Amino acid sequence: MLIVKKFGGTSVANKERIFNVAKRCIEDYKKGNDVVVVLSAMGKYTDELITMARDINEKPPKREMDMLFTIGEQMSVALMAMAMDSLGVPAVSLNAFQVAMHTTSAHGSARLKKIDAARIRRELDNRRIVVVTGFQGIDKYNDYTTLGRGGSDTTAVALAAALHADAWEIYTDVEGVYTADPRKVPKARKLKEITYDEMLDLATLGAGVLHNRSVEMAKKYGVPLVVRSSLNNSEGTVVKEEVTVERMLISGVALDTDAVRIAVIGLKDSPGVAFKLFDTLAKKNINVDMILQSIGRAGTKDISFTVDKNDLDDAMGVLEANQSRIGYVELHAEKNIAKLSIVGAGMMSNPGVAAKMFESLYNEGVNINMIATSEIRVTVLINEKDGVHAMNAVHDAFNLAD
């Protein structure tokens, strides 16, 4: 059996935790399994690298940031291989170059294109545990790239797919996927299982346990996925195509405080305007989420949308540079907002779900600024100061603690 295991930064934050991870991996190895381990940088090391970089340059080039970031994961995998060796088990650490993890050239948000698994297979054939850097790749120029937030999750599922792994396990500082972030909602309950589609929406909308791109890939390649704690032996949560128990009306509530709203005011009310606006952003690799179009002054319209706060400067810059092409009058950015979402496949066959969510927010005096929906989710834009309170109110309204 071939198992791919991914451990986040908190799981390898210090010597004790590194050895804890090493021992867990060795348990599976000694059962005769082939084991591939994907690691993030230790603890808050990536944040420390960002601070160091900005002490030198307030707006460092993205290519150089990628060069810097790769240090963190390389440190983690080398120390892990050393720990396993000290416990009497052969292990080898490999980085993106050695694995030939090819990506696009979008520094800071590259996408995986191809993985050459030959080197990993050779090491597994020699009965070694293979420890691979997450989060990083190489582009066609042989420059380092990074995969953006949640990149180590994406690395792990891509390796699982390339190696035709029998199982993919992701270890975090929580015991699985919960109905809400247990650090913000004390009544949150761990789910035994959840569908790919539900997990994808929760990941996209702010649930930090998994990254949306990794869930997309897991679904695409049918990779079995288990989310569990690195600190104990609890069963965790299974993410798969269909759940075996009766579908819940709502599977979870997510809160995203990393969004900002951009309002483009005074657009001409004519064909092609929306295309020009969002094409301009797409060419800068800026993802747009919630979109609202409203009637403006005579003969004009306004469009508001949300982007990740890390993309705000790039978004405002490219829109200002293309004002004459797009044809708007004013541009505004609003910070201190939050996206609150409910997700659940059960809402497809149950009317009144959105109304129940809106009622719970009304009862708590929370104002809704924007609304977006799909078959299995409802998202509202609210003030950030109301976020955690509103999240708990909605969680209670749908009895998710039961």
Where do the protein language model's features map onto the residues?
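Nucleotide/pyrophosphate-binding catalytic subdomain
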Residues: M1-V215, T306, I382-N383
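A conserved regulatory-domain signal marking ACT and ACT-like small-molecule sensing domains
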Residues: V238-D402
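Surface-exposed amphipathic alpha-helical tracts and adjacent flexible/coil segments at the periphery
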Residues: L210, Y221, N232-T237, L312
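Short phosphate-binding/catalytic loops that engage adenosine nucleotides
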Residues: N33, V89, V223, I286, ...
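Terminal amphipathic helices with adjacent charged low-complexity linkers/tails
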Residues: L39-T46, V227-T244, G299-T300, F305
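Short hydrophobic alpha-helical runs that function as membrane-insertion/retention elements
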Residues: A167-Y171, L225-V227, D289, M370
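Acidic-aromatic/histidine active-site loop/patch
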Residues: A218
